[in-house]
A protein has these predicted regions:
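Pre-active-site segment of Zn-dependent metallo-hydrolases
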Residues: 25-99, 126-139
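Extended recognition/assembly regions associated with phosphoester-bond processing machinery
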Residues: 6-8, 13
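A short helix->loop->beta-strand "cap" motif at the edges of active sites that frequently abuts
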Residues: 25, 116-119
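Di-metal (Zn2+ and/or Mg2+/Mn2+) metal-binding site signature of metallo-dependent hydrolases
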Residues: 91-117, 124
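Residues that form ligand- and interface-recognition hot spots within folded domains
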Residues: 9, 124-126
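Transmembrane beta-strand segments of Gram-negative outer membrane beta-barrel proteins
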Residues: 1-3
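Short beta-strand scaffold segments in enzyme catalytic cores
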Residues: 14-21
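Divalent metal-coordination and catalytic microenvironments
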Residues: 5, 20, 30, 102-103
Length: 139
């Protein structure tokens, strides 16, 4: 059985997501959003959405399309099909954990999209800061 190392995002300096997979075990390093100033999808109007945030993030290239880490409810389309045929956490045999190196947005901002069954590890101070940011709606 071979070990696979994959760079999902971050080769241009931000939005780091790297995985190491061996059999049905996967370790992901960081889970951030890339900074892409060259994209021009912002039109000056911000409308807060509570639904489809994962699908929107994948469409915009703000998070990675990876099987087995996202909740089925966030991937299910109106017709019952799965968004881009991404396999949800609930249907996957892959055992995944995410390690966050430090609390910068380009390293951890997308952990909010992960299924609650995916363990996320980070330094205690980073976890405390993340909780404080979530409490003021900035996390």
């Amino acid at each position: 059985m071979k070990t696979e190392i994959r760079f999902h995002e971050g080769l241009k300096g931000s939005g780091v997501v790297v995985s190491v997979t061996h059999g049905d075990h996967r370790l992901m390093f960081d889970f951030g959003a890339p900074f892409r100033p060259d994209t021009n999808f912002y039109d000056g109007v911000i409308l807060h959405r509570n639904e489809n945030t994962l699908k929107d993030a994948i469409r915009l290239g703000e998070t990675v399309s990876v099987d087995g880490i996202y909740p089925e409810k966030d991937l299910t389309m109106f017709d019952g099909s799965l968004f881009r045929n991404i396999q949800p956490f609930e249907a996957s045999d892959m055992k995944t954990a995410v390690l966050i190196s430090h609390l910068h947005l380009d390293h951890m901002s997308n952990i909010k999209h992960l299924h609650e069954g995916v363990p996320v590890y980070m330094h205690l101070h980073g976890a405390e800061l993340l909780k404080a940011l979530e409490n003021i709606d900035e996390g």
